[in-house]
Amino acid sequence: MSNLPVISIARADGRRPLIFSWGVSSYFGWGVYGLNLMLHLADHPAVVPVCAVEFASGDVVLDPLRKRRMMAMARNSAPLWTALGQTEGDRAGLDHVLLQGLVNDLGAATSAHDRMLHGRPTVGVVFLEAATLSPRGLARAEHFALIVAGSRWNEQVLRNHGIDAVTTVLQGVDTALYHPAPRTGLFPGRFVVFSGGKLEFRKGQDLVLAAFRAFRQRHAEAL
């Protein structure tokens, strides 16, 4: 990173920037992850989340109070976006911890202005969709001080490929949205089971269907 332009963000409150390089949005999975990361770390005493990918008011659907907070956090991130636009070349260094979003085969997503970032250190964050990595993917893994896997299955895939600097961090459940509540009256007399997500091996729909088949044999009202 010695040959790269290095960006450093100074804060008057003494909190250290925690930069993450993926989007913030209410409309796709990574975006929801970034949105909740910012909201839940907004008042952290030691770090402040900074998004390396530009986002605006139209990208998020929130109640007015949380929307106001998110726009303040967008303003906190804007100096980084500006600094990235002023760097030369397609890579930039950061004098801060970087959480780098990774796609399949551990490819890194770019930041604002299509810059590839390098932090001190760089920690990869991944939600693999396949159980195999190419030789190029294995080489990419060596660039990260740690890789955070979004599921235990993801962690096991990485370990099966000889990658040991890996840990699992589950996203959890937003209990403000998902909680017991009075019945809505839809589907009267039925017990409804919802299973979301794309049709992918990693989401285990084959296991869900097998479990539901066994459940419905005992509970005919299940839907």
Predicted region positions:
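A short, glycine/small-residue-rich beta-strand->loop->alpha-helix junction that serves as a flexible
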Residues: 22-33, 203
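A conserved nucleotide-sugar
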Residues: 48, 209-223
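Donor nucleotide-sugar binding/catalytic pocket of nucleotide-sugar-dependent glycosyltransferases
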Residues: 145-156, 163-180
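Extended catalytic core of nucleotide-activated donor transferases of GT-like folds
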Residues: 2-8, 19, 62-157
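N-terminal strand-loop element at the rim of the active site
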Residues: 25-27, 38-85
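Short hydrophobic "strand-cap" motifs at the C-terminus of beta-strands
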Residues: 21-22, 125, 150, 169, ...
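Acidic anion/phosphate-binding donor-loop and adjacent secondary structure
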Residues: 135-136, 173-189
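Conserved donor-binding/catalytic core segment of Leloir-type glycosyltransferases
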Residues: 19, 186-203, 209-212
